[in-house]
């Protein structure tokens, strides 16, 4: 047993890879507060709540799955976006089951997802003191700064390993490669010899963990280039476009001029800057209809902003998916979000405008550098770009997305779902896993 802490610590560090990057540590206090509060006492309080509501709470919440998980292809999801990215595989792989960890919030899809029991997770917290000490020696003060995130990650690997041994799924398909529970399941699959596949569900950055699946279905060359910068690429890779966009590509925006402008924001975008931007555009371009769409995970109080700017419309991301939102817009203004790519695919004119000034996240996805979207450096520049688009919007903006979406301009354009399903089925067959 004395030889185990080394491998165990390395595994935990792998699971927490994103939490110890410079870019994560440099997130704004407002963004970090919802993940890991700055105050040690608040972090400790959240750990206490986790113990009561999750670790102890799960003991009194038995998991009763309607679908049989034995020998099935698991589609592992951590969010509603993940669900939408993987749901199409169910039609192509009879018996495929959407699964998530016990208590995971999948939004409006909670009732459609089977749960993996986490009741035994509490048994593995004897590891925590040694793990935190080991991470302190390796990572320094960041281990203490994020002691709550380290706490949450304990036990996933062991519990998921037990579930894999019990159910023996034919394969596990992921749409997330960096959340702690997803990474723990990936590592457990490697240990138990379960084949793994990955379907990219959003744009990626060079700060992600190395691509570590047996099969990776990426959207385009951009994603592959970035993953190569992250480290060695494991397994097979296929470029299949964006499956979740298929149904919408035939309904691209044909408006000759911009009348409706959507602003997408997330927790990284300060509310004062959002208010300033909306107020400026409402005054400078009064003919435009403005709609604000907060990210579904953004739980800040937008009430004062609603009262300050009653003319602004709102999109509820919990009820309206991103493509449904974009279908109601002619232009998009946003900072660092993959919505820029989704907008461009629908020929919605998209503009990169930063509401915050963190230098580590400037052009985080490289959209400006690769010519996908123009940058507005300040409010007058943003107003000028939108003013020009209000007179004329090009009809061929979507061609800019070819580097990000491998099927654009090919016979498979708008058919990424059957392409991905075919590649996945062939891989399962070649791996000796019945499709």
What are the residue ranges of the model-derived segments?
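C-terminal amphipathic helix plus adjacent low-complexity
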Residues: 1-35, 39-42, 384-435
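Short acidic active-site motifs
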Residues: 159, 204-205, 320-324, 381
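Catalytic binding pocket for nucleotide-activated donors in carbohydrate/polymer assembly enzymes
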Residues: 213, 234-235, 239, 338-409
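Active-site and donor-binding regions of nucleotide-sugar-utilizing enzymes
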Residues: 1-244
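Catalytic donor nucleotide-activated moiety binding site of glycosyltransferases and closely related
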Residues: 135-141, 176-179, 286-318, 361
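Donor nucleotide-activated moiety binding/catalytic core segment of transferases
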Residues: 297-341, 345-346, 355-357
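Conserved catalytic-core segment of nucleotide-activated headgroup transferases in glycan assembly
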Residues: 91-93, 238-308
